[in-house]
Amino acid sequence: SVVLFIGVNGVGKTTTIGKIGAQLRHQGKKVLFCAADTFRAAAVEQLGIWAERTGSGFHSKGQNADPAAVAWEAMDVAIREQYDILFIDTAGRLHTKSNLMDELHKIREVIARKHPGAPHRSILIVDATTGQNALQQTKIFKEAAGIDELILTKLDGTAKGGVAVAVSMQYGIPITYVGLGEKMEDLRPFNGDDFAKALLEQ
């Protein structure tokens, strides 16, 4: 199963991949991380650290490599070495919107060519503190890559996650996880009742 992670820089994409990877490793799954956010050296490095920490595979061509080529090669590795799940980390440079669109289209195209039906899921990571910006981000990423799920990060403290409800309802996308902090166990399955209660208490 191939999962594409999308979202603007700074929302906690790489950390979220690491945390979900850790949960899957605990379930005995063989997981491969692909560093297709090649514009930030820190992103490649950070994903590598998470791979090591979780005992996951790691595929990277370093900084400035062509993201679609990295994804294509990762597909090869995943198929050849029989990984259960491939997580692809992508760039989130919204200020270069058309480049970003092209890049995500290209990544989707090459992985679909490698494995019909891939990516099987496209997950948008949204920072709970971004407010109305999240709606605009969702619109752009939905056009570029399609979105199957939302994961809400930085919900720790007083951050109001109300915008996530707006995004979820407006675009009909389910929220699957919420990130409450930096630790491995701080990523939890989304519970609508708890969430509504927390929102109302604020």
Across the structure, where does each feature detected by a protein language model lie?
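P-loop/Walker A NTP-binding module and the surrounding RecA-like catalytic core of P-loop NTPases
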Residues: 1-202
